[in-house]
UniProtKB/Swiss-Prot annotation:
Entries under InterPro entries matching the protein: rRNA_ssu_MeTfrase_G (IPR003682), SAM-dependent_MTases_sf (IPR029063)
Entry's Gene Ontology molecular function annotations: rRNA (guanine-N7-)-methyltransferase activity
EC number: 2.1.1.-
Species of the source: Clostridium perfringens (strain 13 / Type A)
Name of the protein this chain belongs to: Ribosomal RNA small subunit methyltransferase G
Keywords for this protein: Cytoplasm, Methyltransferase, rRNA processing, S-adenosyl-L-methionine, Transferase
Length: 239
């Protein structure tokens, strides 16, 4: 129970319940992450305490956005090692979480975690973001699309906003310095049917890190021309 108090403090700060069952799931997730990381590249963060703070608590703090407390369906686009989707699924067993990633090795890891943790509310999809968003069963089908992927907001918006229902939200977990990036992305967000709702700053317990949750409202349907074909989204970001 070495990290229980630290994680509970983070949960308390965003109004989420934390208990021993959730803690044990996170610890098993941590062990599987370290084990698989020796076979495939999942994370550069490998120390137990750092995983707890910079992965788990960072994702738990996403619940500072009330939208995550109310949503019934969430898709994590470009989920990688499962962040923030798996922590959201552990914290809220009543929400349906879809984890989407383009690399099959990562999907195999995620399936193992889901099975070992006994998470009944998670499904995984092996797909590129821009391909998945063109599938009828995924497009404009989620209350929230989220991502902690390392890409600028113009790119992330085109990858994520098409998955969101009208009146839903795109929520990006971003680092500390985002003012210029957001100014550059406002037109792109609008083109895709979104409108910037606000930015929520979060402190990561046990560190001196401050991160930002960028919250976008989906106010109208995304034009059928988006997302563009593979490669164009990153090579020629929307302006």
């Amino acid at each position: 129970m070495q990290y229980f108090d630290l994680m509970k403090k983070a949960c308390d700060s965003v109004g989420m319940e934390f208990n021993e069952d959730k803690y044990q799931k996170f610890m098993l997730y941590k062990d599987l992450l370290k084990e698989w990381n020796e076979k495939i590249n999942l994370t550069a963060i490998t120390e137990d305490e750092e995983i707890v703070k910079k992965h788990f608590i960072d994702c738990i703090k996403a619940f500072k956005a009330d939208e995550f407390k109310k949503a019934k369906t969430v898709i994590d686009v470009g989920t990688g090692a499962g962040f923030p989707g798996l922590p959201i699924a552990i914290m809220r067993e009543d929400v349906e979480v879809t984890l989407l990633d383009s690399l099959n090795k990562r999907i195999n890891f995620l399936n193992e975690v889901v099975n070992k943790l006994g998470l009944k509310n998670v499904k995984t999809i092996h797909s590129r973001a821009e391909d998945g968003a063109r599938k009828k069963e995924l497009r404009e089908n989620f209350d929230i699309a989220t991502s902690r992927a390392v890409a600028n907001m113009c790119v992330l918006s085109e990858f994520c906003i098409p998955y969101v229902k009208v009146n839903g939200n795109f929520i990006a977990l971003k680092g500390p310095n985002i003012t210029e990036e957001l100014n550059d992305s406002k037109n792109a967000i609008g083109t895709l049917g979104g409108k910037l709702k606000g930015i929520t700053e979060v402190e990561i317990e046990g560190t001196d890190l401050n991160h930002n949750l960028v919250i976008v409202d989906k106010i109208k349907s995304t034009p059928k021309t988006f997302p563009r074909k593979a490669g164009n989204v990153t090579k020629k970001p929307l302006k």
